[in-house]
From Swiss-Prot:
One GO CC annotation: nucleus
Chain segments carrying region Disordered: 1-41, 76-102
Family indicated by similarity: Belongs to the type IV zinc-finger family. Class B subfamily.
Protein's recorded name: GATA transcription factor 15
CDD domains: ZnF_GATA
Chief location of this protein within or outside the cell: nucleus
SUPFAM superfamilies for this protein: Glucocorticoid receptor-like (DNA-binding domain)
Protein's UniProt keywords contain DNA-binding: yes
Source organism per UniProt: Arabidopsis thaliana (Mouse-ear cress)
Amino acid sequence: MLDPTEKVIDSESMESKLTSVDAIEEHSSSSSNEAISNEKKSCAICGTSKTPLWRGGPAGPKSLCNACGIRNRKKRRTLISNRSEDKKKKSHNRNPKFGDSLKQRLMELGREVMMQRSTAENQRRNKLGEEEQAAVLLMALSYASSVYA
C-alpha cells in the first residue's frame, strides 16, 4: 500500500515543478511580446503603424493599412475591368468590312426571297378561280384592317 505522506511529497514536488515551468513560460512570452512591441508593424505603402485593420497587398498578407489596402484593391479592380472591356472591343471590331459585306449579302438574299414569294403568289392566284381570289382578297383586307386599327 501507499503511504499517505509519500503522496503529499509527490504532490508538493509536482507543484514546485509546475510553478517553475510557468515561470519559464511567462519569461519566454514576455520576451516575445517585447520583440513584437519593438518591431512595430508598418504599412508597405504609406508607413503608418496605427490602423484598425490590416489588409493584404503585393507585399503579402496584412502588409497594408486599411486605407492603402482599399485603394490597392480598387486599382486592381479597375485594371481588370479595363482589360475585359478592351477584349470586348477587340472582339467586336475584328473586321468591320466583313460585317458590312455580310449585311449587304443578307439584304440581297432577303430581296431575292421576296421576289420569289411574289412570283409564287402570282402563280397561285392564276390557278385560283374568281371566287377564291375574292376570298383571299377579303381575308387580306380584314387582316390589314385589324393590324392598322
